[in-house]
Amino acid sequence: MKRAGIKAQVGYRGPRARKGEASIVTPNRLQRQFNPDSPDKRWVTDITYIRTREGWLYLAVVVDLFSRKVIGWSIQPRMTKEIVLNVLLMAVWRRNPQKQVLVHSDQGSQYTSYKWQSFLKSHVLEGSMSRRGNCHDNAVAESFFQLLKRERIKKRIYGTRDETRSDIFDYIEMFYNSKRRHGSSEQMPPAEYENLYYQRLRSV
């Protein structure tokens, strides 16, 4: 290519992921069953990256598949095991599930770690993982990140990490969970859809 005078096109690159061998891989128990009939039956989780002028930030979320509500989220400057544990702890603390919940992720090293698997067992959660390289197995989590980047980030580069955290908080807690309507939830925002479910349950 060099001799022919051809230059390779270099695309936009995200942060480099650390390579690590999978230690514990669980079966794909979710099997793309994205529409449970009640809250706290199936959760999905994933990580994405956000660019700032102070460096990269990593956003991890946990989404309840019933309502598409973000029930846990964490932003950290490094993609470590702690970020996924923190976000799952937030989800457990907020929801306090009374029955076993299926928690689905990809096969990233954070999720195949002993710490992740140990946390699941100690909190009566059942693990599930996408097939390697198959993003469609975790389509709802991927869809949330696409919405976030299309509706709020819009290809911008945040000035500071603090600004980023504040804006992501606003999007998730003040807009997405409480105002954004979803076709999968009768065109209601996640919080309203869950409230309606519990109202109907009490009236039975």
Regions found by a protein language model. Give the residues of each.
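Charged DNA-binding/catalytic regions of mobile-element recombinases
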Residues: 1-204
